């Protein structure tokens, strides 16, 4: 057996339409799939441009609550301009800090799921 990659990370959200608007229109993720199996089951899957790992915006289920995911990391090549652009789109980001061969800022989605925006300044993510 060999696990070869992380395919999809489920993000629990209280309102899939609001979350879709945030991830697609504010963060710029690409919508891959939006399929409603029934009124209770909807699969909303997005991906950052150029990435392989996707996210799925899911209604919370047993053991999962909206806003309960923390420490998700996305990478940028220019944290300063990305920080300014996202701030201009209404995202509340922390100040940029530098440590461990990288520059970081944090933010939350509308449900409180926590993200880290990183720009590698060394071999940290090589």
Where are these regions (language model features)?
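A short local loop/turn or secondary-structure capping micro-motif enriched for an aromatic residue
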Residues: 62-66, 123-126
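Core segments of cupin and vicinal oxygen chelate
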Residues: 10-52
